[in-house]
Design a protein with these regions (language model features):
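NTP/phosphate- and nucleic-acid-binding module
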Residues: 1-368
């Protein structure tokens, strides 16, 4: 699980760095004073609240607006310091009444959250679109097809936000989407109903589907800078409140969604981009030639920097194959009496029922 999360986080990190995001580490313990300034201490009902031995009140971080705004206030006092985009990848805590579905909705979960600060609405709008495109690249690189969905801003904003939804029965949201264009809206904010013509293209009737939210982007406006009395000097020397954007991706939920979308009745089917290993090497038999052949293949793969899970257990083939299907690594390489006799390797893709025999010289080419 950890190696999958690391790969997902690195995909995210790569795209955030490309668009100018600066990675930092923000506090997990939030002073209550910060939350009281924004009104969130009493208004947000999912806060885990704790008291120190010195009777100071804190909240476990469920989002970072109350922490990141004072950081920007200290380090970006002028329009020359903007735009500023900072992000972190870490753990969040929410006192959910109905935590369920494992890592899809828990009281502790992984999150990438980025915040951007801008002098003008035009500059924010420009960056907002850049982040949306970066998010599409992230989800594509994770093997997912997402729908950019109009949604409510919830506790964060009174403006329309955008959520990145993946169609799956494991989701908790209902969306209406068009098959002929990119229009998609959460049923909570949609002015149209299922079966009505798409308001964007007018070509198809809107379909209803269940989806999982894997990311979101919000226009927070000037709400948080006003709460903290954060202003910057503009080009004319005037004090103005910066405009803030918020961009989140639930890393553990993203992993769970990938598992739900690509899994089958036998187990998991990890896309190669996030799979914990590229190859599941299964050795069948314990005679010297089989062991030597399997060990040599393992070392050859490792020398090519190919991640390999080597199953050298003394179990029946059926048990090993069942475990292999359950784990869901993209390629299974089998070394057995049959393959050793023919100087070949049996290769099977996890998402295929067919296997082929490939010469040992060519087996690595399959992974290229």
């Amino acid at each position: 699980m950890k190696s999958i999360l690391i790969k997902i986080e690195n995909i995210i990190r790569n795209e955030m760095d490309k668009i100018g995001g600066q990675e930092i580490r923000m506090a997990t313990l939030h002073p209550s004073d910060n939350w009281k300034k924004t009104g969130g201490w009493d208004a947000v009902d999912v806060l885990f609240k704790v008291n120190s031995r010195t009777e100071k009140e804190y909240a476990l971080g469920q989002s970072e607006e109350e922490i990141v705004t004072p950081i920007a206030q200290e380090y970006a006092p002028s329009y020359r310091d903007l735009p500023l985009a900072i992000y972190q990848i870490g753990q969040k805590y929410r006192d959910e009444l109905r935590a369920k579905s494992g890592i899809m909705r828990g009281r502790e979960f992984g999150m990438k959250d980025m915040y951007s600060f801008h002098e003008s609405q035009d500059d924010f709008d420009r960056f907002y679109e850049i982040v949306k495109e970066a998010y599409l690249s992230i989800f594509k690189n994770c093997g997912l097809e997402v729908k950019v969905t109009e949604a409510s801003g919830g506790n964060f904003s009174d403006k329309i936000s955008y959520e990145f939804m993946v169609l799956t029965d494991a989701g908790e949201d209902d969306i209406l989407y068009c098959l002929s264009c990119t229009h998609c809206a959460n049923v909570e904010v949609s002015k149209e109903k299922e079966g009505e013509l798409c308001p964007k293209c007018g070509k198809s009737k809107l379909q209803r589907g269940t989806a999982a939210e894997v990311g979101n982007v919000f226009d927070l406006g000037k709400k948080y800078p006003k709460s903290f009395e954060y202003t910057v000097k503009d080009k004319d020397g005037n004090d103005v409140h910066p405009i803030v954007g918020c961009y989140g991706i639930g890393t553990t939920r993203l992993m769970g969604t990938i598992a739900e979308v690509f899994g089958d009745e036998k187990g998991l089917v990890w896309p190669k981009e996030v799979s914990p290993f590229q190859v599941h090497l299964v050795r069948l038999g314990v005679n010297e030639k089989i062991i030597e052949s399997a060990d040599r293949l393992y070392e050859d793969l490792r020398k090519k920097n190919i991640e390999v899970l080597y199953d050298d257990r003394d179990l029946r083939p059926g048990e090993k194959f069942a475990d292999s299907d359950l784990i869901g690594i993209p390629f299974r390489f089998v070394v057995s009496d049959k393959t050793v006799e023919q100087n070949k390797i049996e290769v099977k893709k996890r998402n295929s029922s067919e296997s082929v025999l490939v010469s040992q010289d060519d087996v690595i080419k399959i992974l290229e």
